[in-house]
Amino acid sequence: MTWDSFGVASRELATSVADSGYEPDIILAIARGGLLAAGALGYALAVKNLYTMNVEFYTGVDERLPVPMILPPVPDLVELRFARVLIVDDVADTGHTLKIVEDFFRGRVKEVRSAVLYEKSHSVVQCQYVWKHTDLWINFPWS
């Protein structure tokens, strides 16, 4: 992925969210991979409330921990119980990172959906908003 294709991807992903009628109250970036995509979607969708969650899973190229771990601090769920949350990451590879974050929010907020630039066929979650499907390793301009 190049910076130019990232711009195209962000705009097209935002259009998918907007066209679906979903209006998130907050956008939650999975750090670090989802930070730039979440910021771009925040601007495109006019959502100013951006949150982050740090999840450790990948330790290197195709090297991961046995299970993903949510690292503190975490968002205040009492504060967000009536919120529609859009979780954003760069890629749903195994999907385990997105799943742990979705599970953290599901049943505790009004609604949770997810958006990614890329989703792989073996992902354990299927995101509502996906720019491209691939099974190749993706080189992002920020990594």
Functional labels for PLM-detected ranges:
Residues 1-143:
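PRPP-associated nucleotide enzymes
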